[in-house]
Amino acid sequence: MLRVYHSNRLDVLEALMEFIVERERLDDPFEPEMILVQSTGMAQWLQMTLSQKFGIAANIDFPLPASFIWDMFVRVLPEIPKESAFNKQSMSWKLMTLLPQLLEREDFTLLRHYLTDDSDKRKLFQLSSKAADLFDQYLVYRPDWLAQWETGHLVEGLGEAQAWQAPLWKALVEYTHQLGQPRWHRANLYQRFIETLESATTCPPGLPSRVFICGISALPPVYLQALQALGKHIEIHLLFTNPCRYYWGDIKDPAYLAKLLTRQRRHSFEDRELPLFRDSENAGQLFNSDGEQDVGNPLLASWGKLGRDYIYLLSDLESSQELDAFVDVTPDNLLHNIQSDILELENRAVAGVNIEEFSRSDNKRPLDPLDSSITFHVCHSPQREVEVLHDRLLAMLEEDPTLTPRDIIVMVADIDSYSPFIQAVFGSAPADRYLPYAISDRRARQSHPVLEAFISLLSLPDSRFVSEDVLALLDVPVLAARFDITEEGLRYLRQWVNESGIRWGIDDDNVRELELPATGQHTWRFGLTRMLLGYAMESAQGEWQSVLPYDESSGLIAELVGHLASLLMQLNIWRRGLAQERPLEEWLPVCRDMLNAFFLPDAETEAAMTLIEQQWQAIIAEGLGAQYGDAVPLSLLRDELAQRLDQERISQRFLAGPVNICTLMPMRSIPFKVVCLLGMNDGVYPRQLAPLGFDLMSQKPKRGDRSRRDDDRYLFLEALISAQQKLYISYIGRSIQDNSERFPSVLVQELIDYIGQSHYLPGDEALNCDESEARVKAHLTCLHTRMPFDPQNYQPGERQSYAREWLPAASQAGKAHSEFVQPLPFTLPETVPLETLQRFWAHPVRAFFQMRLQVNFRTEDSEIPDTEPFILEGLSRYQINQQLLNALVEQDDAERLFRRFRAAGDLPYGAFGEIFWETQCQEMQQLADRVIACRQPGQSMEIDLACNGVQITGWLPQVQPDGLLRWRPSLLSVAQGMQLWLEHLVYCASGGNGESRLFLRKDGEWRFPPLAAEQALHYLSQLIEGYREGMSAPLLVLPESGGAWLKTCYDAQNDAMLDDDSTLQKARTKFLQAYEGNMMVRGEGDDIWYQRLWRQLTPETMEAIVEQSQRFLLPLFRFNQS
């Protein structure tokens, strides 16, 4: 007997199942109970509730509907295989074989054009998979189409795609028969199965004694027919969560309505019959001419299409008994009001049909201002949504001591996009406000890095082996462990790979395979050769076979190079081995071999690696089962594996005890005291999934067809019904960039509208309906602040935050932050090394952070370039020019230096490197000639100088008889001049009587004349004073910007500063040009040390820079004689 139990509470239906199991024991104690479910989460919940009732839940099978129906086919009908030859995966592989054979037919012209240029069979496999997916749906929802197609006939009224789908299906059936596989599939078994059961006078052997169907929102029509036929022989209890106690489906015709009017539902607890309609006499007025019911409740009408179709299909079953197990909902708060309206099929919304109704609001229901059973929260970002949720959950737990974390479920439209924010907020909360939580339904690929690493390894034949991509593999601990590379070792390797010139490509063969010219440099083989040479010899000994040894890879940590070489050897072996197409059976052991070659599993990764191997073997087994005989490229298997790992969801922690956080998915109507919905944004939910262009079902839909949009609408309805105490909804209602308004999901808006149209706040009785509706909406919707540290979040109320870490920022109460720069007392030491002064005056602001605060913002660049050098600029060019210039000045062999740079891979390849070198040689030679012309034998001068109460000590290198001579391969800059000025003052104060010169590129020069010792000490004393001030607070000396101002305002002929308006305006322009830079030249204001002091250059800051620059830089311009 098929019995359909209707109830608005899933827990009541589950209690009914417990009652039946306890009262009607199975004859065979070893026979398992059979409970059909649609998800593992529902199975887990049922196991938990059953174990609470009986103390144990064992010997229970939880099959999915499709597998259960096929199992029944196997048990009832002879010669039916345990697995269908027409499952989706098997059909995909068979279509891979069939499609190329059919493409020359006229019906397949469109597909023939699509499959051109498909050397790797990727398009063919994707098309086969999509077609197989469609056929799989047709087997369930359109079996009559397939029956006609098998006879060679077309179905009237279908789209153009039928022209190729019909012969393709027929060919698929015939090909399956040719393979020696049964031609049976679900479409041609339903009727045979039903007829066999209908004609059987006794129960066929092997059938279960009874079957429960629990928590399934909808079943396809053919499944219901099959279950009805089974119900003739066994007990089938279909437990349906029905949000409404009255019939709210459609009808076929007046006769169907007459049949419904004669039907009664028996109350499951009381011996009485209940009608299907509230008003049976006027039931005919509920339906239009097409048989569609004007559902009384607007929310049920909008969200319930899936359930409405299912109600219709259930009512169409002939031999079934319906039982009523509805539980009255006491309308004692807003949530229960809405649930009651849906249950009773009532519409309490007052839209103001006439002026009298519109003018007052007291014909609505009053809403308690303290009622928080339904709340709407508007946030600016997913991060704020989760932060607000965490605070609100803490408030709920504080308010209700009986509430526990396991009573709360949080559902998100896309759990993968919210997981990082959930882990950041929930996972980082301190112990005093930590909420235990469990995230379910994440994609398997995001659950463990091993999965993503394995997919990357399967891409080796197509890889360019970019340095960052290879090193990223070593970020996976179990892969690094396989090659004995620790986290510290990886830091060394990252530095070595960068400095040894590795950019991309395993070796020259790999480069040629990519149809690019091989250079012999910048590949992994080139870099490894440099590292291994560095272990054997020093770079000072010269290059070996045009390769320069890399010195850093020597010593005790040199074994790292060997480990890296082992990894690269394996990568190269597998790159070659995976490149060729193979028959499927030869691909079978590849997965296990690769896992063994690249990973050293631990307890945490064992499950992930098992999942990889299971899915790989399943793909291969399906293809072999379909007897696919052609060679298969790796890319096809890789894409299929990646897709399956994306679809695989990690759900084993659902209902584990903490706050349950999961995705909104079917059959999640498990009752919870608190139901929270996040990310309910317009355009995000209901989720959009456009049907395929050749999906004939979408072109001609029928009642009972599944639609992602209808499913999501019904999910929202189920979430509302399953909430027992509170329904919490949040969405991103404001832009985080400009605070502009964004809209919620249409489902949320419909709920808000219905509440506003059916409720009013006390005191609003005299307002018209629109005004009271607006006030209700404003009352229920809480707009949260953009930032968590806003002072509003720490006032009593629904926005109150528990996050103590933001309290110091919020307690400023809107006041501006105190100034970052606060003077620190600094006492000059008795002795100051000259090197310290030089370091300070090279960049006074940076020196304050580094030397005084011990703070360094300049982290080393961790990103390794992914291309070889084509041009050299910036630091690389300066470093080469520095060595080249010194070599030319010393009149060494520049050609030897060229060979050294080329052997290290520092130069562009081939003629480009030669051209670059020649250009630099010509420019540096001009500079070197100027230096050689003035150069004399020099010696180091010891400095021990008393000035301004301190002793300056150190050495001045290369002091010539006629003074100081310095050279740099850089352009003229004030910063370079300051360094020479400091040395010049020390030199003169120590008794030197020569001049100081600094030669720079493009005829740039700084030249200072001899100064008397007293005069030099005077200026040196100023610099020491500047050092003292700069170690107490940042000294705003910006040499280039301030120097540009001084250069414009200083009149060298009259030794005066010009301050007329015209000159000051020009000086300001020059200052800003140097500070801001342009497209070609980086401005001084981009310096991170200055940006830490101020976000924007204010007039006050600019005035301070000019003042300090004039104080310390003016002597440079006054004494410069270049």
Curated annotation (Swiss-Prot):
Which top-rank group of organisms is this from?
Bacteria
How would you summarize its activity regulation?
After reacting with DNA bearing a Chi site the holoenzyme is disassembled and loses exonuclease activity, DNA unwinding and Chi-directed DNA cleavage; RecB remains complexed with ssDNA, which may prevent holoenzyme reassembly. High levels of Mg(2+) (13 mM MgCl(2+)) or incubation with DNase allow holoenzyme reassembly, suggesting it is DNA bound to RecB that prevents reassembly.
Disrupted-gene phenotype? Decreased degradation of DNA with free ends that is unable to undergo homologous recombination, which can fortuitously lead to more efficient viral infection. Cells are deficient in DNA recombination repair and have increased sensitivity to UV light. The cultures have many inviable cells. Cells can be transformed with retron Ec48-containing plasmids.
What happens on changing Q38A?
Answer: Acts at variant Chi sequences
Query: Into which family does the record put it?
Result: Belongs to the RecC family.
- Relay the record's extra comment: In the RecBCD complex, RecB has a slow 3'-5' helicase, an exonuclease activity and loads RecA onto ssDNA, RecD has a fast 5'-3' helicase activity while RecC stimulates the ATPase and processivity of the RecB helicase and contributes to recognition of the Chi site.
HAMAP family linked to this entry: RecC
Q: What is this protein called?
A: RecBCD enzyme subunit RecC
Record organism: Escherichia coli (strain K12)
Q: Which gene encodes it?
A: recC
